[in-house]
Each structure stands twice: as C-alpha cells, then as structure tokens.
Curated annotation (Swiss-Prot):
Encoding gene (name): psbE
SUPFAM superfamilies assigned to the protein according to its UniProt record, in alphabetical order: Cytochrome b559 subunits
Family per record: Belongs to the PsbE/PsbF family.
Keywords assigned: Cell inner membrane, Cell membrane, Electron transport, Heme, Iron, Membrane, Metal-binding, Photosynthesis, Photosystem II, Transmembrane, Transmembrane helix, Transport
Compartments, record wording: Cell inner membrane
Protein name: Cytochrome b559 subunit alpha
Species this chain originates from: Gloeobacter violaceus (strain ATCC 29082 / PCC 7421)
Binding-site residues, heme: 24
Length: 84
C-alpha cells in the first residue's frame, strides 16, 4: 500500500506554528475562565437543576433517610419522605 499525501499540513507543523498559538492561547484562556465563572457563580446549579450543597437538607430534615432492609427500601423511603 502506498502512502500518499492528502494535501493537508502535518499536525506537528500546525502545533509548532506561531499563528496557531496566537489564535488558541486567548481562546483556551477564555474557555477556562468562562467555565470557572459558570461553576463559581452557581449558574451551573440553576441550569442543570441540581441543589446547591447547602440545600440538600433543610433545617427540618437534618437526618439522612436510613434504609435497613433491602426489600423494604421503597416503603422505608416513602415513610421517611412522608414525615417531612
């Protein structure tokens, strides 16, 4: 099988070029900063609908529901949520 060129630049030429890094350094920095702010501001919790760490258990329900028997788990969880 003969190896023919596809006419594309080799990957090593691309990543060692100055032009590549001039374009990608700001882009990578902006992506990192925006991802950090997305999580840090709590917007990720709002977008994905997950509770914030301080909202998992309210002041009325400070104990985790405990399941003792494997086959009665649904019944035990229903009782634990009914007591709220």
């Amino acid at each position: 099988m003969s190896s023919r060129s596809t006419g594309e630049r080799p990957f090593t030429d691309i990543i060692t070029s100055t032009r590549y890094w001039i374009i990608h350094i700001p882009a990578i920095t902006i992506l990192f900063a925006s991802g950090f702010l997305f999580v840090y501001t709590g917007l990720a919790y709002d977008v994905f609908g997950t509770p914030r760490p301080d909202e998992y258990y309210n002041s009325d329900n400070t104990k985790k529901p405990l399941v003792n028997k494997r086959f009665e788990a649904k019944q035990q969880l229903d009782e634990a949520t009914k007591n709220k």
